[in-house]
Amino acid sequence: MSAQNPLFSGSIVALVTPMNHYGEVDFSCLEKLVEHHIEAGSNALVSVGTTGESATLSIEENVKVIEKTVEFAKGRIPIIAGAGANATSEAITMTKLLRDSGVAGCLSVVPYYNKPTQEGMYQHFKAIAECTDLPQILYNVPSRTGSDMKPETVARLAEIENIVGIKEATGDVSRIVKIKQLAGKNFIVLSGNDTTGLEAIKLGAEGVISVTNNIAAKDMADMCRYALAGDFDKAEEINARLMRLHHDLFIESNPIPVKWAAYRLGLIKSPHLRLPLTTLSEEIQPKVEDALKIAGLL
Protein backbone atom coordinates (compact mmCIF):
# COMPACT_ATOMS: atom_id res chain seq x y z
CA MET A 1 0.00 0.00 0.00
CA SER A 2 1.24 3.48 -0.87
CA ALA A 3 -0.13 6.97 -1.32
CA GLN A 4 -0.13 6.31 -5.11
CA ASN A 5 -1.82 2.89 -4.79
CA PRO A 6 -4.00 2.84 -1.66
CA LEU A 7 -5.61 -0.39 -0.51
CA PHE A 8 -9.09 1.18 -0.61
CA SER A 9 -10.10 4.15 -2.77
CA GLY A 10 -12.73 5.61 -5.05
CA SER A 11 -16.47 5.02 -4.84
CA ILE A 12 -17.19 2.59 -2.01
CA VAL A 13 -20.80 1.56 -1.48
CA ALA A 14 -22.31 1.57 2.01
CA LEU A 15 -24.53 -1.27 0.85
CA VAL A 16 -28.14 -1.70 1.95
CA THR A 17 -29.23 -5.13 3.17
CA PRO A 18 -32.35 -6.06 1.16
CA MET A 19 -35.15 -7.67 3.14
CA ASN A 20 -38.56 -9.11 2.38
CA HIS A 21 -41.81 -8.00 4.04
CA TYR A 22 -41.15 -10.39 6.94
CA GLY A 23 -37.79 -8.81 7.74
CA GLU A 24 -35.78 -11.72 6.38
CA VAL A 25 -32.65 -11.00 4.35
CA ASP A 26 -33.37 -11.37 0.63
CA PHE A 27 -30.21 -13.08 -0.62
CA SER A 28 -31.33 -13.32 -4.25
CA CYS A 29 -31.80 -9.56 -4.27
CA LEU A 30 -28.44 -9.10 -2.56
CA GLU A 31 -26.76 -11.07 -5.34
CA LYS A 32 -28.35 -8.78 -7.94
CA LEU A 33 -27.15 -5.71 -6.04
CA VAL A 34 -23.58 -7.00 -6.03
CA GLU A 35 -23.76 -7.57 -9.80
CA HIS A 36 -25.24 -4.11 -10.29
CA HIS A 37 -22.37 -2.42 -8.49
CA ILE A 38 -19.72 -4.41 -10.29
CA GLU A 39 -21.24 -3.46 -13.65
CA ALA A 40 -21.54 0.20 -12.58
CA GLY A 41 -17.84 0.43 -11.70
CA SER A 42 -18.04 0.77 -7.92
CA ASN A 43 -14.64 0.24 -6.29
CA ALA A 44 -15.65 -1.69 -3.15
CA LEU A 45 -18.69 -2.66 -1.08
CA VAL A 46 -19.21 -2.28 2.66
CA SER A 47 -21.38 -5.17 3.81
CA VAL A 48 -23.48 -4.74 6.96
CA GLY A 49 -22.39 -1.29 8.01
CA THR A 50 -24.78 1.35 9.32
CA THR A 51 -26.61 1.51 5.99
CA GLY A 52 -26.75 -2.30 5.99
CA GLU A 53 -28.67 -2.26 9.31
CA SER A 54 -25.92 -3.86 11.37
CA ALA A 55 -27.62 -2.70 14.57
CA THR A 56 -30.65 -4.93 14.00
CA LEU A 57 -28.92 -8.02 12.61
CA SER A 58 -27.59 -10.67 14.97
CA ILE A 59 -23.89 -11.57 14.91
CA GLU A 60 -24.79 -14.78 13.06
CA GLU A 61 -26.81 -12.83 10.48
CA ASN A 62 -24.04 -10.25 10.11
CA VAL A 63 -21.51 -12.95 9.33
CA LYS A 64 -23.83 -14.78 6.92
CA VAL A 65 -24.67 -11.63 4.95
CA ILE A 66 -20.99 -10.72 4.70
CA GLU A 67 -19.99 -14.24 3.63
CA LYS A 68 -22.73 -14.35 0.99
CA THR A 69 -21.68 -10.93 -0.30
CA VAL A 70 -18.12 -12.23 -0.71
CA GLU A 71 -19.48 -15.35 -2.42
CA PHE A 72 -21.55 -13.30 -4.87
CA ALA A 73 -18.62 -10.98 -5.64
CA LYS A 74 -16.41 -13.89 -6.78
CA GLY A 75 -13.27 -11.82 -6.25
CA ARG A 76 -14.35 -9.13 -8.70
CA ILE A 77 -14.77 -6.35 -6.14
CA PRO A 78 -13.33 -5.95 -2.61
CA ILE A 79 -15.78 -6.51 0.24
CA ILE A 80 -15.29 -4.58 3.47
CA ALA A 81 -17.07 -6.08 6.47
CA GLY A 82 -18.91 -4.01 9.02
CA ALA A 83 -17.52 -5.48 12.22
CA GLY A 84 -17.93 -2.81 14.88
CA ALA A 85 -19.64 -2.95 18.25
CA ASN A 86 -19.79 -0.87 21.41
CA ALA A 87 -18.39 -3.80 23.41
CA THR A 88 -14.77 -4.54 22.54
CA SER A 89 -15.25 -8.26 23.18
CA GLU A 90 -18.15 -8.40 20.71
CA ALA A 91 -16.17 -6.54 18.04
CA ILE A 92 -13.30 -8.99 18.53
CA THR A 93 -15.69 -11.94 18.21
CA MET A 94 -17.08 -10.55 14.95
CA THR A 95 -13.61 -9.85 13.58
CA LYS A 96 -12.37 -13.35 14.42
CA LEU A 97 -15.42 -14.94 12.78
CA LEU A 98 -14.56 -13.07 9.57
CA ARG A 99 -10.92 -14.16 9.51
CA ASP A 100 -11.37 -16.71 6.72
CA SER A 101 -14.38 -15.14 5.03
CA GLY A 102 -12.48 -13.59 2.14
CA VAL A 103 -13.17 -9.97 3.07
CA ALA A 104 -10.60 -7.37 2.10
CA GLY A 105 -10.85 -5.60 5.45
CA CYS A 106 -13.10 -4.58 8.32
CA LEU A 107 -14.86 -1.31 9.12
CA SER A 108 -15.10 -0.74 12.86
CA VAL A 109 -17.14 2.08 14.37
CA VAL A 110 -16.26 4.16 17.42
CA PRO A 111 -18.16 2.56 20.34
CA TYR A 112 -21.59 4.10 20.66
CA TYR A 113 -23.78 4.94 23.67
CA ASN A 114 -21.13 4.19 26.32
CA LYS A 115 -19.03 7.24 25.25
CA PRO A 116 -15.43 6.10 25.86
CA THR A 117 -12.58 8.54 26.41
CA GLN A 118 -9.92 9.02 23.74
CA GLU A 119 -7.76 6.49 25.60
CA GLY A 120 -10.69 4.08 25.69
CA MET A 121 -11.12 4.42 21.93
CA TYR A 122 -7.41 3.80 21.42
CA GLN A 123 -7.42 0.66 23.56
CA HIS A 124 -10.63 -0.59 21.89
CA PHE A 125 -9.26 -0.40 18.36
CA LYS A 126 -5.81 -1.61 19.40
CA ALA A 127 -7.35 -4.75 20.93
CA ILE A 128 -9.36 -5.43 17.76
CA ALA A 129 -6.33 -4.95 15.51
CA GLU A 130 -4.26 -7.31 17.63
CA CYS A 131 -6.76 -10.15 17.17
CA THR A 132 -6.47 -10.28 13.37
CA ASP A 133 -4.31 -9.76 10.32
CA LEU A 134 -7.21 -8.21 8.40
CA PRO A 135 -6.80 -4.53 7.46
CA GLN A 136 -8.86 -2.33 9.77
CA ILE A 137 -10.68 0.88 8.82
CA LEU A 138 -11.74 3.08 11.72
CA TYR A 139 -15.16 4.75 11.53
CA ASN A 140 -15.78 8.09 13.21
CA VAL A 141 -19.42 9.25 13.10
CA PRO A 142 -20.17 11.39 16.18
CA SER A 143 -23.74 12.15 15.09
CA ARG A 144 -24.57 8.49 15.70
CA THR A 145 -22.10 7.40 18.37
CA GLY A 146 -22.15 10.44 20.66
CA SER A 147 -18.34 10.43 20.72
CA ASP A 148 -15.81 12.10 18.45
CA MET A 149 -12.45 10.41 17.89
CA LYS A 150 -9.89 13.20 17.64
CA PRO A 151 -7.23 13.32 14.90
CA GLU A 152 -4.52 12.87 17.52
CA THR A 153 -6.08 9.54 18.57
CA VAL A 154 -6.36 8.50 14.93
CA ALA A 155 -2.67 9.27 14.47
CA ARG A 156 -1.76 7.03 17.43
CA LEU A 157 -3.83 4.22 15.97
CA ALA A 158 -2.25 4.72 12.54
CA GLU A 159 1.01 3.49 14.04
CA ILE A 160 -0.54 0.00 14.35
CA GLU A 161 0.36 -1.89 11.18
CA ASN A 162 -3.02 -3.25 10.15
CA ILE A 163 -5.02 -0.11 10.98
CA VAL A 164 -4.86 1.29 7.47
CA GLY A 165 -7.45 4.05 7.32
CA ILE A 166 -10.55 5.81 8.57
CA LYS A 167 -14.05 6.59 7.39
CA GLU A 168 -14.32 10.19 8.56
CA ALA A 169 -17.97 11.20 8.89
CA THR A 170 -17.97 14.38 10.94
CA GLY A 171 -18.67 16.40 7.79
CA ASP A 172 -15.79 18.73 8.70
CA VAL A 173 -13.49 18.52 5.68
CA SER A 174 -10.68 20.24 7.59
CA ARG A 175 -10.36 16.94 9.46
CA ILE A 176 -9.07 15.35 6.25
CA VAL A 177 -6.08 17.68 6.20
CA LYS A 178 -5.45 17.33 9.94
CA ILE A 179 -5.52 13.52 9.87
CA LYS A 180 -3.23 13.40 6.84
CA GLN A 181 -0.78 15.72 8.57
CA LEU A 182 -0.72 13.69 11.78
CA ALA A 183 -1.14 10.13 10.50
CA GLY A 184 0.96 10.37 7.35
CA LYS A 185 0.21 10.36 3.65
CA ASN A 186 -0.09 6.56 3.43
CA PHE A 187 -2.95 6.45 5.95
CA ILE A 188 -6.20 6.19 3.99
CA VAL A 189 -8.91 8.76 4.66
CA LEU A 190 -12.36 8.07 3.21
CA SER A 191 -15.17 10.59 3.44
CA GLY A 192 -18.31 9.31 5.12
CA ASN A 193 -20.45 12.23 3.93
CA ASP A 194 -21.86 12.39 0.41
CA THR A 195 -22.48 16.13 0.61
CA THR A 196 -18.80 16.87 1.24
CA GLY A 197 -17.25 13.85 -0.48
CA LEU A 198 -15.90 15.74 -3.49
CA GLU A 199 -14.41 18.48 -1.30
CA ALA A 200 -12.80 15.77 0.83
CA ILE A 201 -11.12 14.25 -2.23
CA LYS A 202 -9.85 17.68 -3.25
CA LEU A 203 -8.22 17.94 0.18
CA GLY A 204 -6.53 14.55 -0.04
CA ALA A 205 -9.12 11.89 0.78
CA GLU A 206 -8.79 8.69 -1.23
CA GLY A 207 -12.52 8.28 -1.80
CA VAL A 208 -16.02 8.17 -0.36
CA ILE A 209 -17.94 5.49 1.52
CA SER A 210 -21.26 6.56 0.12
CA VAL A 211 -24.98 6.08 0.68
CA THR A 212 -25.89 7.81 -2.58
CA ASN A 213 -24.05 5.24 -4.68
CA ASN A 214 -26.62 2.61 -3.68
CA ILE A 215 -28.89 4.25 -6.25
CA ALA A 216 -26.49 6.33 -8.39
CA ALA A 217 -23.62 3.88 -8.62
CA LYS A 218 -22.24 4.82 -12.04
CA ASP A 219 -22.49 8.54 -11.37
CA MET A 220 -20.65 8.20 -8.06
CA ALA A 221 -18.00 5.95 -9.59
CA ASP A 222 -17.47 8.46 -12.41
CA MET A 223 -17.38 11.41 -10.02
CA CYS A 224 -14.75 9.79 -7.82
CA ARG A 225 -12.69 8.68 -10.81
CA TYR A 226 -12.67 12.17 -12.29
CA ALA A 227 -11.88 13.78 -8.94
CA LEU A 228 -9.02 11.41 -8.14
CA ALA A 229 -7.60 12.12 -11.61
CA GLY A 230 -7.78 15.86 -10.94
CA ASP A 231 -10.57 16.54 -13.45
CA PHE A 232 -12.63 18.56 -11.00
CA ASP A 233 -14.82 20.25 -13.62
CA LYS A 234 -16.34 16.92 -14.69
CA ALA A 235 -16.56 15.77 -11.07
CA GLU A 236 -18.33 18.99 -10.07
CA GLU A 237 -20.85 18.61 -12.89
CA ILE A 238 -21.91 15.19 -11.60
CA ASN A 239 -21.83 16.22 -7.96
CA ALA A 240 -24.04 19.26 -8.57
CA ARG A 241 -26.69 17.06 -10.16
CA LEU A 242 -26.58 14.67 -7.20
CA MET A 243 -26.45 17.26 -4.41
CA ARG A 244 -30.20 17.37 -3.74
CA LEU A 245 -30.13 13.57 -3.53
CA HIS A 246 -27.13 13.64 -1.17
CA HIS A 247 -29.21 15.77 1.19
CA ASP A 248 -32.60 14.09 0.83
CA LEU A 249 -31.27 10.59 1.44
CA PHE A 250 -30.89 11.78 5.03
CA ILE A 251 -34.27 13.51 5.30
CA GLU A 252 -35.15 10.68 7.70
CA SER A 253 -32.69 8.41 9.47
CA ASN A 254 -30.37 6.45 7.18
CA PRO A 255 -31.07 3.92 5.66
CA ILE A 256 -34.81 4.70 5.56
CA PRO A 257 -34.76 7.04 2.52
CA VAL A 258 -32.16 5.11 0.50
CA LYS A 259 -34.06 1.84 0.88
CA TRP A 260 -37.22 3.52 -0.35
CA ALA A 261 -35.31 5.08 -3.25
CA ALA A 262 -33.74 1.74 -4.17
CA TYR A 263 -37.20 0.18 -4.10
CA ARG A 264 -38.63 3.01 -6.21
CA LEU A 265 -35.91 2.39 -8.81
CA GLY A 266 -36.52 -1.36 -8.80
CA LEU A 267 -33.13 -2.23 -7.33
CA ILE A 268 -34.71 -4.05 -4.37
CA LYS A 269 -38.10 -5.74 -4.02
CA SER A 270 -39.16 -4.12 -0.75
CA PRO A 271 -38.29 -0.98 1.24
CA HIS A 272 -38.72 -2.96 4.48
CA LEU A 273 -36.48 -2.26 7.47
CA ARG A 274 -36.34 -3.91 10.86
CA LEU A 275 -37.85 -2.14 13.82
CA PRO A 276 -37.27 0.34 15.35
CA LEU A 277 -36.75 1.71 11.82
CA THR A 278 -39.88 2.11 9.71
CA THR A 279 -40.37 2.77 6.01
CA LEU A 280 -40.19 6.30 4.62
CA SER A 281 -43.12 8.49 5.65
CA GLU A 282 -45.70 8.94 2.90
CA GLU A 283 -45.50 12.73 3.10
CA ILE A 284 -41.72 12.58 2.59
CA GLN A 285 -41.77 10.21 -0.39
CA PRO A 286 -42.51 12.94 -3.00
CA LYS A 287 -39.42 14.88 -1.86
CA VAL A 288 -37.16 11.89 -2.38
CA GLU A 289 -38.85 11.18 -5.71
CA ASP A 290 -38.15 14.76 -6.80
CA ALA A 291 -34.51 14.32 -5.81
CA LEU A 292 -34.32 11.17 -7.94
CA LYS A 293 -35.73 13.12 -10.90
CA ILE A 294 -33.29 16.00 -10.44
CA ALA A 295 -30.45 13.46 -10.37
CA GLY A 296 -31.69 12.03 -13.67
CA LEU A 297 -32.51 8.64 -12.17
CA LEU A 298 -36.24 8.82 -12.96
UniProtKB/Swiss-Prot annotation:
Binding residues annotated for pyruvate, in chain numbering: 51, 209
GO biological process: one example: lysine biosynthetic process via diaminopimelate
Gene Ontology cellular-component terms listed: cytosol
Site (Part of a proton relay during catalysis): 50, 113
Subcellular location: Cytoplasm
Primary localization: cytoplasm
Keywords, alphabetical: Amino-acid biosynthesis, Cytoplasm, Diaminopimelate biosynthesis, Lyase, Lysine biosynthesis, Schiff base
Positions of the catalytic residues: 139 (proton donor/acceptor), 167 (schiff-base intermediate with substrate)
Pathway where it operates: Amino-acid biosynthesis; L-lysine biosynthesis via DAP pathway; (S)-tetrahydrodipicolinate from L-aspartate: step 3/4
EC top class named in words: lyase
SMART domains recorded: DHDPS
EC number in record: 4.3.3.7
InterPro entries cross-referenced by the UniProt entry: Aldolase_TIM, DapA, DapA-like, Schiff_base-form_aldolases_AS, Schiff_base-form_aldolases_CS
GO molecular function terms noted in the UniProt entry: 4-hydroxy-tetrahydrodipicolinate synthase activity
Reactions catalysed: L-aspartate 4-semialdehyde + pyruvate = (2S,4S)-4-hydroxy-2,3,4,5-tetrahydrodipicolinate + H2O + H(+)
Assigned protein family: Belongs to the DapA family.
Assembly and oligomerization: Homotetramer; dimer of dimers.
Reported function: Catalyzes the condensation of (S)-aspartate-beta-semialdehyde [(S)-ASA] and pyruvate to 4-hydroxy-tetrahydrodipicolinate (HTPA).
HAMAP family according to UniProt: DapA
Official protein name in the record: 4-hydroxy-tetrahydrodipicolinate synthase
Organism phylogeny: Bacteria, Pseudomonadati, Pseudomonadota, Gammaproteobacteria, Pasteurellales
Gene this protein is translated from: dapA
